[in-house]
Amino acid sequence: MNQNQLLTSRQIIMLHIGFSIVYISGLFIPLMENDSAQHASMAMRMTLNNDFLHIFKGENPYLDKPHMHFWLAALSMKMFGISHVAYRIPALLCLALGAFSTKKLAEILYDNEHTGYLASLIFLSAQTIILSAHDVRTDAVLTGFIIFSIWQFVRFIKTQHISSAILAGLGTALAFSSKGLMAIVIIGFCILAYLLYSRDWKKFFNLKIIIVALSFAIGIIPVLYAYHVQFGDEGIRFILFNQSVNRLTASGFEETSPDYFFFFHTLLWAFLPF
């Protein structure tokens, strides 16, 4: 083993196998209340009615989270039957995409394959990621697409490959289709931080960025169409503007006492054991 390496190749393989067992075994745990079971029932309704353009929460039209999480869960139920295992499969696959993208991103940033493996292990071992694979909501799907998009953006800035520009736009579109504009904000801040560090502004702001914009615009057409079919122009306004504004202004949320240490104590458990 190289003295600069924290883990041997054997240890890395064994740890990845161990985490794979943890995540796969989590497929068979009964769904938690409230959101996981609720989202599963909403996806099940799509499957049974063969209707992927309308989302209902009980008997009421659901104008909140975008369609991607429900689409993936419903398609999985179509393929594997209606069960909590089928509901969790897309989340598990998206987290696998997130772990792989984390590895590849770390390799680009540090020019070191070993660091990439360590980064993927840190990602897989974080308590919040393990929880998102078991208590499945939109988080697992969103996380996988966001990390994939950031990896492709950084790869595009480094290499100027057209394929990375297309994948960066599509990855951002998938993240948007999972959570709305907040996903774009997260990706944007990450890329801005990288550009401030690398100073590669000209490699980002050039004509090829139009390819990113076009692939993003094409990628969000399905979710915009679904919102328009169910809610008309109100649905388009909601996903493009109102949803994010409501979250930033806390409109529609119950008023509670502010917890100024919320992110501090949340991060303490979310990234255990690191």
Regions found by a protein language model. Give the residues of each.
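Membrane-interface transmembrane helices that cradle and orient dolichyl/undecaprenyl
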Residues: 3, 108, 149-165
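Transmembrane signal-anchor helices characteristic of membrane glycosylation enzymes that use polyprenol
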Residues: 7-36, 214-227
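Transmembrane-helix signature of polytopic, membrane-embedded enzymes
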Residues: 9-17, 102-125
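Transmembrane-lumen/periplasm boundary regions of multi-pass, lipid-linked membrane glycan transferases
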Residues: 42, 174, 178, 183-274
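Membrane-interface alpha helices of multi-pass inner-membrane proteins
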Residues: 131, 164-179
